[in-house]
């Protein structure tokens, strides 16, 4: 049974390694249950399942609740295709065919638990943090366009958790929001909070869309201590025609 994050969450750069691992793992451990998840395999799950008969199934889309229910399924000792088919958000095999068990309700970001209470486990590591999920843009070359609705974590929760990082003098916090500044009010409020509570040590990394930065945001960013804020700007193409595609 394999639900490790290293094998479970698939991105494009990992595919060649995952392909080899899936095939070889099944040879070594024929009884192992192999599940994959992540954007690359969720996009065309039925095709992936047909291409790799070694797979037990694929977790589609957001994995928090699906992963939990799948783990509970195995822990309970329940077996059989019928039991798996009751878990939403899966691509599985049933009666020799690949089926989808139905869509999973999108996760409310404000109910996801904070995982960094014990920082000893993350000593000398970059901490990843999510204050929003989804992207409002429709770039045809980007899988983020699949999740068209942007959801925000409650700002009171975000501020409390960021204050914890500041109090603990964490070296770096990397926001994994797809386009952090797609919601100006949300972004500005977080930046203003970080500016007011700067501890002189912690720096914050954001992925942004530079073309929607306005003068107000730039003025605010210019007030930060040098090195406090890192901006990752994706230059996908210098061709306006391609960017409009």
Task: Kindly label every feature range from the protein language model.
Residues 2, 33-34, 130, 230:
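Short glycine- and Lys/Arg-enriched binding-loop motifs that mark or flank ligand-binding interfaces
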Residues 20-23, 49-52, 73-74, 106, ...:
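Short, glycine/charged-enriched secondary-structure capping and boundary segments
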Residues 103-109:
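A short, sequence-level motif marking secondary-structure junctions
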Residues 1-11, 242-245:
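Single conserved hydrophobic/aromatic residue that forms the stacking wall/gate
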